[in-house]
Regions:
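C-terminal ends and interior cores of transmembrane alpha-helices
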Residues: 96-117, 312-334
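Intracellular juxtamembrane helix-capping segments at the cytosolic ends
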Residues: 130-146, 353-368
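Short amphipathic helix-loop junctions that connect adjacent transmembrane helices
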Residues: 37-63, 252-273
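A gly/Pro-rich, aromatic-decorated transmembrane alpha-helix motif that marks the paired
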Residues: 36-37, 78-82, 163-179, 322-325, ...
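Cytoplasmic membrane-interface "Motif A"-like loop-to-helix N-cap segments
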Residues: 86-98, 296-317
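Conserved MFS/SLC helix-loop-helix module at the cytosolic interface between two early adjacent transmembrane helices
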Residues: 76-100, 105-106
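Central cavity-lining transmembrane alpha-helices of secondary-active solute carriers
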Residues: 63-85, 167, 277-292, 386
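Intracellular loop-helix junctions on the cytosolic face of multi-pass helical membrane proteins
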Residues: 1-21, 145-148, 152, 156, ...
Length: 444
């Protein structure tokens, strides 16, 4: 890759490769979230035996496997980071793992048994997870000292592209599943992933390609400074993991709850899995609001650091999860509440996501030395993995042999709401004690 630029050009403007990365991310996120949006519905309604008969899962089992898959998606970034920073570089790692990703979608589209589900999700976990730290770190690599002031804004638009892809897919794939079955519903995301790979390949000559550090990368990770950095970050990420334990239940528990609600909203019948599209739509609306209005207004009165944003977001998450707790109480009493109440919960939870997730993404990149960017981004992804692993473990633990749950009804939501409240209070103390250092790429 000697014919590629290996350092950012001095420029106050937007790097030339950014549009290709954003376009790739939008298409890739369509494929991932479109597939993920229908997983619980597929496992509880469409899963087949090898003889073609129905072999659906109970709700607790489906939630357990769903969160185990999401956890795997966010554990595999460590593999991608090791390949990227230590051997192949970000660009080649993304291309290779994206092709594996496409094969996973193909497996889900053609085989609807538990074996096909396992193979498809395994390949997708390796591909989708492996490219995650590389893509987000690749964004930061395009910037130098003269345009680093645009980094925060571009990370916001990077997150915006994620949610544009997610919004469109979360409306489309549940409809495809309902009207055309799982073959087309899983096949369309596969086509979008292939398009995402091609878009990224087209931008190869516009990118800054930071060379892999090889053994230098390993030595830096295992050095005293590297281990101290990971130690500091691990404590922060442990608390953020609890946020993800709650947040990612929008794709499992919240979908199953929506099946028991009145689906008509403003005269439109909304499929239970489609209500998830509220989240990416709200993110696209709230990112500009927070970036250009809320944060500047608050900063004039109070210094709004990255960790303070995350702390506030955790308390907002407590409020957000209180709403489905109340909804479930109504359902337990025989009521059929409007799905509009879940929409309100999404407004509050998405506000928390903007404060926690986007800020943590930027925080992770700026805390990492040059040769550890992808590794630290992967380390951040571990917080999502740990959170989902916890939720999966809880669901498998509370599942009775007959498929029922030990934490039935509203008690399930009350448990997670209380857990988030305790976490938010303790995080205030941890954030006050954190001492870090900021790293930005040098220009040439």
């Amino acid at each position: 890759m000697t014919h590629y630029r290996t350092a950012p050009l001095p420029s106050p403007g937007l790097p030339a490769g950014i549009p290709y990365i954003i376009g790739n991310e939008a298409a890739e996120r369509f494929s991932f979230y479109g597939m993920r949006a229908i997983l619980v519905v597929f496992m509880t309604q469409y899963l087949l035996n090898t003889d073609g008969t129905l072999d659906s899962m109970a709700e607790a089992e489906a939630k357990g496997w769903y969160h185990l898959f999401v956890s795997a998606v966010y554990f595999t970034p460590l593999l991608g980071a090791l390949l990227s920073d230590g051997l192949l570089g970000k660009y080649r790692t993304i291309i290779v793992l994206s092709l594996i990703y496409v094969l996973g979608h193909f497996a889900l589209a053609v085989d609807h048994t538990r074996l096909g589900l396992a193979i498809g999700l395994g390949l997708i976990a390796a591909g989708a997870g492996g490219i995650k730290p590389c893509v987000s770190a690749h964004v930061g690599d395009q910037f130098g000292e003269s345009n680093q002031h645009l980094l925060s804004r571009v990370f916001s638009w990077f997150y915006f592209s994620i949610n544009l892809g997610a919004f469109s897919s979360m409306l489309a794939t549940p409809w495809l599943m309902e009207h055309h079955g799982p073959a087309l519903a899983f096949g369309v995301p596969g086509v979008l992933m292939l398009i995402a790979t091609l878009v990224f390949w087209w931008g190869r000559k516009r990118f800054v390609h930071i060379p892999p550090a090889g053994m230098t990368f390993v030595r830096e990770v295992l050095s005293g400074d590297g281990l101290r950095l990971l130690g500091r970050l691990s404590l922060i990420y442990l608390f953020i993991a609890v946020f993800w334990a709650l947040f990612d239940q929008t794709g499992s528990a919240w979908v199953l709850q929506a099946q028991k609600m009145d689906h008509e909203l403003f005269g439109i019948n909304i499929l239970p899995a489609q209500i998830q599209a509220a989240n990416p739509l709200l993110v696209m609306l709230l990112i500009p609001l927070f970036s250009y209005k809320v944060y500047p207004a608050v900063s004039r009165l109070w210094t709004l650091t990255q960790l303070r944003k995350i702390s506030i977001g955790m308390f907002v998450t407590v409020l957000a999860f209180s709403i489905p707790t109340w909804i479930q109480m109504q359902i337990d009493q025989g009521g059929v509440p409007s799905i509009g109440w879940q929409l309100l919960a999404y407004v509050v939870l998405t506000s928390a996501e903007v404060m926690v997730a986007i800020t943590a993404l930027e925080f992770s990149y700026t805390q990492a030395p040059r040769t550890m960017k992808s590794f630290v981004m992967a380390f951040f992804m571990m917080s999502i993995a740990v959170g989902n692993l916890f939720t999966s473990a809880v669901n498998f633990f509370i599942m009775n042999q007959d498929g029922s749950s030990k934490l039935a009804g509203a008690a399930y939501y009350e448990f997670f709401t209380l857990l988030m409240l305790v976490t938010a209070v303790l995080f205030i103390l941890v954030a006050r004690l954190y001492k870090g250092e900021t790293f930005i790429q040098e220009e040439r």
